[in-house]
């Protein structure tokens, strides 16, 4: 549920479907990634305290004892000053006695503006989970898609979150480097995962969105996307090179609308079974004679 008064779409992870969506910002502070059109045309704005309080009051009025989870929207709530975030978290704890978890998207530049201690304070105040779109660990690909950070910074952002004790749900995008950069993208992303050690890992497939620069590049013949089987081969190379400690449990999912195949595993325990599932998927997808290169679902 959500109670904001804006007419722009609200985006949230699938696992936040039953959460109270509390909009604390509008749009995305970066809003320059070439593959994304989520907030194009939406001026970035930090909502006033009065508007945030109004949403919380309405949610408390209609479901004070029902709210278990809260998701802070829009694209990068962590851009807020730490003091303001801590105040919001305090109010949420006061208003919702059965609150179990607060979560948010987090952009790498916003994470890097926070110290480990600040992240730890927010975790203790109730911000238990961050959804982090690292997308890739590869320098060249990050630069090409205008992510705003390099590989070292992308890794440090993720590492800082896990070091604070927060849960980290990290997202990567299969096919982001195109056919030419696929192997490099896969290997560097696996290296990043090994350093960060996320608690959750989601592999999405590239979608060429209307209004994105990457779509323009494809239509101009400057970007060569992977086939569905090629996307699975890239995922196989990533999984083959993930080397997590036996006592570190990472929940892997590929259940986004962009995925051709839904996969689930706990790494490193299920690594070999996951690789067998991927091999089967490659064999089946290789039979496709045509597919929607835009990956519109």
Role assignments for model-derived ranges:
Residues 109, 137-141, 161-185, 204-210, ...:
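Conserved strand-turn element in the central/C-terminal portion of the radical SAM core barrel
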Residues 117-119, 177-195:
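Catalytic cores of alpha/beta
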Residues 20-22, 70, 100-104, 130-132, ...:
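Hydrophobic faces of well-ordered beta-strands that scaffold small-molecule active sites
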Residues 60-163:
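Conserved SAM/AdoMet-binding glycine-rich loop
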Residues 1-16, 194-297:
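Auxiliary Fe-S-binding modules of radical SAM enzymes
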Residues 7-54:
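Canonical Radical SAM [4Fe-4S] cluster-binding loop centered on the CxxxCxxC motif
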Residues 52, 85, 115, 154, ...:
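Aromatic/hydrophobic pocket-lining residues that form the small-molecule binding cavity
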Residues 28, 36, 52, 72, ...:
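Conserved, mostly hydrophobic/aromatic
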